């Protein structure tokens, strides 16, 4: 039971970590060089932004190794990071950005809100004034629209994400 709680707690901490990294590193001067590719149109399967996933995968691999040989709790933390990575891949890369071989656009509920919130995140050109930096949690869409309108960066065609 303790190991399960470690995994669940790690998934929750990873959402906070991902929010922070996305907001202040990826959209900051330090990380925009990689993340910019994610905000630009392209016709290739991979983006420079995917290197962030490699960084977290390497970190999880190190934790798996150290946990297996020296400190077992790190193994369970690495498993939580891996579970979060899988959730991220399904929700962000798959559902929101359609990086899988079929197209599915959610029509209602949690997945719709997540989809719309991330569309609004991409409604801004450049790295400033974006909204909704989390990947599992998305603020209410109406609040995000208000924030974008207040900042003056929301284009009319982006007011109703599809």
From Swiss-Prot:
Domain of life: Bacteria
Catalytic activities: all-trans-beta-carotene + 4 reduced [2Fe-2S]-[ferredoxin] + 2 O2 + 4 H(+) = all-trans-zeaxanthin + 4 oxidized [2Fe-2S]-[ferredoxin] + 2 H2O
Enzyme Commission code(s) on record: 1.14.15.24
Keyword terms of this UniProt record: Carotenoid biosynthesis, Oxidoreductase
Function: Catalyzes the hydroxylation reaction from beta-carotene to zeaxanthin via beta-cryptoxanthin.
Enzyme class: oxidoreductase
Pathway, per record: Carotenoid biosynthesis; astaxanthin biosynthesis
One GO-annotated biological process of the protein: xanthophyll biosynthetic process
Family, as annotated: Belongs to the sterol desaturase family.
This protein's name: Beta-carotene hydroxylase
Record domain Fatty acid hydroxylase: where: 8-135
Keyword Oxidoreductase among UniProt keywords: yes
GO molecular function, one term: beta-carotene 3-hydroxylase activity
């Amino acid at each position: 039971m303790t190991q399960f709680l470690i995994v669940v707690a790690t998934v929750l901490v990873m959402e906070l970590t991902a929010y922070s990294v996305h907001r202040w590193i990826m959209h900051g001067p330090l990380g925009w060089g990689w993340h910019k590719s994610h905000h630009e149109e392209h016709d290739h399967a991979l983006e420079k932004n995917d290197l962030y996933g490699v960084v977290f995968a390497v970190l999880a691999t190190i934790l798996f190794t150290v946990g297996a040989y020296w400190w077992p709790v790190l193994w369970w933390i690495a498993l939580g990071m891996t579970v979060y990575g899988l959730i991220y891949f399904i929700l962000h890369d798959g559902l929101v950005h359609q990086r899988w071989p079929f197209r599915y656009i959610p029509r209602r509920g949690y997945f719709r809100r997540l989809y719309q919130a991330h569309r609004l995140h991409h409604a801004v050109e450049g790295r400033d004034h974006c909204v909704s930096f989390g990947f599992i949690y998305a603020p209410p869409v109406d609040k995000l629209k208000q924030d974008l309108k207040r900042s003056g960066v929301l284009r009319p065609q982006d007011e109703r994400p599809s």
